[in-house]
């Protein structure tokens, strides 16, 4: 099945997309030597609701990534409809590119990964790639207990991403600048959108 295409899938709510997401994309492309990184905003997340509508989040992602080589922003999950489960996205792009994709998640996802829909299938049908966030050790220990052998998981050697979309929304709500938190292409629009 493997065509040799090195494809990464970077899903998330991107509510909003921030400089940490851009950093993860740059390092992922470089470290994994990807042919393509597909950024997939969630349409209908199973565990939390988004603040910004899909169209707005998709538009921001397009603006931020339009000049970045090898990056594609996909609206697959909107087109699919229903609840946005990662396994369906992985299976879809596996079939399109005839390869086992890399699936990129934040380190904090390891603390509840076993709660993801068909998480064993995710581990089987993709190579899990984890980028660092905050302190990783407790997450790794939890993942080891629940998932067992972590040797198949790729842990990216890159700066720790300490920015969160939740923090950004709160900063905007109380009128603080988002300079340095979100890319300049969308900063003013994001400040207004989430502002009080």
Curated annotation (Swiss-Prot):
Gene that this polypeptide is encoded by: nadD
Annotated function: Catalyzes the reversible adenylation of nicotinate mononucleotide (NaMN) to nicotinic acid adenine dinucleotide (NaAD).
Key words of the record: ATP-binding, NAD, Nucleotide-binding, Nucleotidyltransferase, Pyridine nucleotide biosynthesis, Transferase
UniProt xrefs under InterPro entries: Cyt_trans-like, NadD/NMNAT, Rossmann-like_a/b/a_fold
EC number: 2.7.7.18
Gene3D superfamilies: HUPs
Family matches, as Pfam families: CTP_transf_like (PF01467)
PANTHER family: NICOTINATE-NUCLEOTIDE ADENYLYLTRANSFERASE-RELATED, PHOSPHOPANTETHEINE ADENYLYLTRANSFERASE
Catalytic activity: nicotinate beta-D-ribonucleotide + ATP + H(+) = deamido-NAD(+) + diphosphate
Pathway: Cofactor biosynthesis; NAD(+) biosynthesis; deamido-NAD(+) from nicotinate D-ribonucleotide: step 1/1
Family: Belongs to the NadD family.
GO terms, molecular function: ATP binding; nicotinate-nucleotide adenylyltransferase activity
Keyword Nucleotide-binding: yes
Protein name in the entry: Probable nicotinate-nucleotide adenylyltransferase
Keyword ATP-binding attached: yes
Domain of life: Bacteria
Residue ranges that the Swiss-Prot or TrEMBL entry lists as coiled coil: none
Root EC class: transferase
């Amino acid at each position: 099945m493997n065509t040799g295409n090195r494809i990464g899938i970077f899903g998330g709510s991107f509510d909003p997309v921030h400089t940490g997401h851009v950093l993860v994309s740059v390092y992922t492309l470089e470290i994994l030597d990807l042919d393509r990184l597909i950024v997939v905003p969630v349409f209908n997340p199973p565990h939390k609701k988004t603040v910004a509508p899909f169209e707005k989040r998709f538009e921001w992602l397009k603006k931020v990534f339009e000049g970045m080589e090898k990056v594609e922003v996909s609206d697959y999950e909107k087109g699919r409809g229903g609840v946005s489960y990662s396994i369906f996205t992985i299976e879809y792009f596996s079939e399109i590119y005839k390869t086992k994709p890399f699936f990129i998640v934040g380190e904090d996802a390891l603390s509840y990964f076993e709660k993801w829909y068909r998480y064993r299938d995710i581990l089987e049908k993709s190579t899990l790639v984890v980028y660092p966030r905050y302190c990783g050790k407790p997450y790794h220990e939890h993942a080891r207990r629940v998932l067992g052998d972590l040797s198949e998981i790729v842990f990216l050697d890159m700066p720790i991403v300490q920015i969160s979309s939740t923090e950004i929304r709160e900063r905007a709500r109380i009128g603080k600048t988002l300079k340095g938190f979100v890319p300049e292409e969308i900063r003013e629009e994001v400040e207004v959108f989430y502002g009080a």
